Design a protein with these regions (language model features):
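A hydrophobic, helix-centered structural microdomain
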Residues: 1-55, 90, 167-188
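Positions in alpha-helical segments
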Residues: 3, 31, 71-75, 107, ...
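Short amphipathic alpha-helical surface micro-motifs
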Residues: 11-14, 25-30, 79, 103-104, ...
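Intrinsically disordered, low-complexity boundary segments flanking structured domains
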Residues: 15-19, 34, 109, 116-122, ...
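Short charge-dense sequence patches
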Residues: 20-26, 36-39, 83-85, 126-136
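Short, glycine-rich, amphipathic interfacial segments at transmembrane boundaries or analogous
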Residues: 31-69, 131-157
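A short, structured surface patch at a secondary-structure boundary
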Residues: 63-130, 178-180
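C-terminal terminal-structure detector
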Residues: 121-188
Length: 188
């Protein structure tokens, strides 16, 4: 219900974002990608498109700062995290929550420690979480790495999973409010 109200209130803003995306580059307004949701069920996440449309490369599903495919509008949307607002559609559809561990692509879920996997996938993924706040500058960190994917798997992902476990093991309304507050403070 809250996501429907949010979508309704944000509809004019969504229209402006969509118009800016379409005016800058051809292609769809939304970027869709398979992610792993609650109980390991795959779903296709919504995000506002921030990159030029290119054929799937089969390469690494990571984007680093300075990637030439990122459009000017896309750079703004990424920096402000406005590209994530489209995930309110996923919340409305019931595949995501406002707060919860961020959903990963299957390629990285395969790196979850087996003893944690069931717990980590026992809740609906969220638009934001403690790891989103901590790694707000993830693209910049990955751009500095010699091997961005290795850096993600060996350094960033384990820390994100620790944050996710903390959230899963302490699911309180107060924690949700704290995450939302921290997220808003990093965006504004």
């Amino acid at each position: 219900m809250a996501s429907a109200a949010g979508l309704l209130l944000l509809a004019p803003f969504f229209a402006l974002i969509a118009l800016a995306i379409k005016l800058e580059s051809p292609g769809p307004v939304f970027f869709r990608q398979e992610r792993v949701g609650r109980h390991g069920r795959p779903f296709r996440i919504f995000k506002f498109r921030t990159m030029t449309v290119a054929p799937p490369s089969g390469g690494v599903p990571l984007t680093v700062a300075g990637d030439a495919r990122i459009t000017r509008v896309g750079a703004f949307l990424r920096k402000s995290k406005l590209d994530e607002l489209a995930q309110l559609i996923d919340v409305l559809r019931g595949t995501m929550s406002l707060v919860g561990p961020r959903p990963e692509v299957p390629r990285y879920v395969a790196h979850y420690p087996p003893e944690w996997r069931e717990r980590l996938l026992s809740v609906r993924p969220g638009i934001t979480d403690f790891a989103s706040v901590r790694y707000r500058d993830e693209n910049d960190l990955l751009a500095q790495a010699h091997d961005p994917e290795r850096e993600y798997i060996d350094v960033i992902l384990p820390t994100k999973l620790q944050y996710a476990l903390h959230y899963v093991d302490r699911p309180t309304f107060a924690n949700d409010l704290r995450v939302i507050g921290l997220t808003l403070s990093t965006v504004f």
